[in-house]
């Protein structure tokens, strides 16, 4: 009987210890601790990311070949593409589009895009925008969700609209 009482008392103490730890892990945050991020701002950016898959200095490299030779499906490509605020490839670079794209469609050219727009100049220097979504390359407009960010874009949410401005199959860009 004494052992039963000790076990019961130990269970009660353990329950209270776990319950009090649980309260500390999931507490509501006071808005004053968010600093400059407590107010939402709307920012509209127009950037151009220049993807090059071949040539002397490709910005994207396939690291996993397709599973089947009949489609790109299953291939994985890592990218570190220059970002600019203007169309020409020789425009001033303001950051990098870094991440990967995975060929995830069998009947079309469709990719799962996982990337950060990492800005390296101006007021956005050191900030990133994180994008995760589906990119069907042959569609005129592709929409992908913004799932977060860092720096000035902390707590970012929204969407990206991708449009192909130019495509040169021979040059690979």
Swiss-Prot record:
Pfam families according to UniProt: Dirigent (PF03018)
GO-annotated biological processes: phenylpropanoid biosynthetic process
Cited InterPro entries: Allene_oxi_cyc_Dirigent, Dirigent
Signal peptide: 1-22
Residue positions the entry lists as glycosylated: 69, 90, 125
Any GO CC annotation of this UniProt entry: apoplast
Domain of life from the UniProt record: Eukaryota
Localization in the cell: Secreted, Extracellular space, Apoplast
Keywords from the UniProt entry: Apoplast, Glycoprotein, Secreted, Signal
Protein family membership: Belongs to the plant dirigent protein family.
Biological role: Dirigent proteins impart stereoselectivity on the phenoxy radical-coupling reaction, yielding optically active lignans from two molecules of coniferyl alcohol in the biosynthesis of lignans, flavonolignans, and alkaloids and thus plays a central role in plant secondary metabolism.
Oligomeric form and interacting partners: Homodimer.
Full protein name: Dirigent protein 8
UniProt lineage: Eukaryota, Viridiplantae, Streptophyta, Embryophyta, Tracheophyta
């Amino acid at each position: 009987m004494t052992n039963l009482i000790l076990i019961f008392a130990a269970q009660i103490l353990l329950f209270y210890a776990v319950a009090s730890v649980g309260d500390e892990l999931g507490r509501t945050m006071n808005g004053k601790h968010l600093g400059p991020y407590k107010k939402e701002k709307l920012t509209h950016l127009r950037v151009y990311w220049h993807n090059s898959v071949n040539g002397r200095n490709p910005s994207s490299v396939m690291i996993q070949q397709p599973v089947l030779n009949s489609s790109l499906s299953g291939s994985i490509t890592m990218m570190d593409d220059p970002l600019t605020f203007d169309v020409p490839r020789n425009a001033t670079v303001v950051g990098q589009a870094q991440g990967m794209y995975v060929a995830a469609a069998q009947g079309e050219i469709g990719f799962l895009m996982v990337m950060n727009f990492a800005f390296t100049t101006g007021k956005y220097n050191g900030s990133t925008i994180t994008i995760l979504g589906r990119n069907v390359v042959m569609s005129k407009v592709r929409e992908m969700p913004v799932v977060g960010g860092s720096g000035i874009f902390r707590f970012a949410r929204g969407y990206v609209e991708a449009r192909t401005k130019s495509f040169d199959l021979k040059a690979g860009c």
